[in-house]
Amino acid sequence: PVYVPTTRVPSMLPSLPYLPSSGSSQQASPVSSHSIWTQPGAESAAYNPGSSHPPVSPRFSFSTSTPIPSTSSRDAAAAYSSSLSLSANGREQYSRGFGSSYSSPYPAYVSPEMATTWTSSPFDSPMLHNLQSRGTPAAARHANIEFFDDYSEGRECVNCGAMSTPLWRRDGTGHYLCNACGLYHKMNGINRPLFKPQRRLSASRRVGLSCANCHTTTTTLWRRNAEGEPVCNACGLYMKLHGVPRPLAMRKEGIQTRKRKPKNLNKTKTPAGPSSSESLTPTTSSTSSSSSATTTEEMRPIKTEPGLSSHYGHPSPISQAFSVSAMSGHGSSIHPAISALKLSPQAYQSAISQSPQASSKQDSWNSLVLAENHGDIITA
């Protein structure tokens, strides 16, 4: 569809063939759609006098700028049909009468100069002519491939003499190298050796070997010294660690292996807990010196849980509740109780919870003092 702005209409009025030449100031309404799809009824109704333009196509609607002045419908129809019969740009096969359902789109509404620019073939462009004037690209491409094939036939690796390779490379002087030699030279900085590296000696080839230092023939691992001579594992490790040859006096007939622990040692070994004689039984010595030494050793603060401090009623350590004289007098009986408390505070807490609680906060300590006076031993 072609939309003509109202500002350009006055300059196009002389070139429109279907308008009368009486000089009446008319303005063409904007065309809504391509007139080739319009029906004859819609075209005849579009030029009724005294009415505004209805939409040319029922699919689109545009408002007109000014209504057409009252002219005879026959004159307008005759002028329009005569314009359709013009053979503009040699298109007689597309021009039909007014009563036909198809009409030529551009000469009726647009000037011939504009119509020729818009109705030109999409292939009539200078770009197409330039593409056609150029040679066929396929032929040039095949020619280049053949040229490179001919040029690459004479290549040869200057190191190993290979004639074919997935990728040709060059060394520092510009000579061609195959992919393997080029990569080796790039990574190591030297030319790739032409012979394959020697494989490790098999078991049959190691039969006649002997250590160059101790002259043994049995070893778990053969090594080489600085001169490249084969040495046994012991001599090689000794030389590596100490920097001097291994003395011949250290030679042994058998191979000394590392004493490794068996894998099932942890499964067969039973866990050894704290001995009951060390933690729960009192000391057998009855001398005062041993009793006083044990008492001073056990005067260290007992580590308890934070929740037990509120049960005791005072933040001071348990060792401060007893005097040195009281503990020294009953060292044989108080020692196992304190050691039991130090080793297992949870067990002592359970023992305290089982004892009857009185209104006083220090009833648990009173029961401990009573048990101590009677010579009883509190066990977990």
From Swiss-Prot:
One of its GO terms (biological process) is positive regulation of transcription by RNA polymerase II. GO terms for molecular function: DNA binding; DNA-binding transcription factor activity, RNA polymerase II-specific; RNA polymerase II cis-regulatory region sequence-specific DNA binding; zinc ion binding. Residues 257-266 have a biased composition (Basic residues). Residues 14-35, 58-73, 275-296 have a biased composition (Low complexity). More abundant in heart, with lower levels detected in ovary and small intestine. The keyword Hydrolase does not apply. One of its GO terms (cellular component) is nucleus. Pfam families: GATA, GATA-N. Keywords: Activator, DNA-binding, Metal-binding, Nucleus, Repeat, Transcription, Transcription regulation, Zinc, Zinc-finger. The keyword Disulfide bond does not apply. Transcriptional activator. Binds to the consensus sequence 5'-AGATAG-3'. This is Transcription factor GATA-4. It comes from Gallus gallus (Chicken). The lineage of its organism: Eukaryota, Metazoa, Chordata, Craniata, Vertebrata. The gene is GATA4.
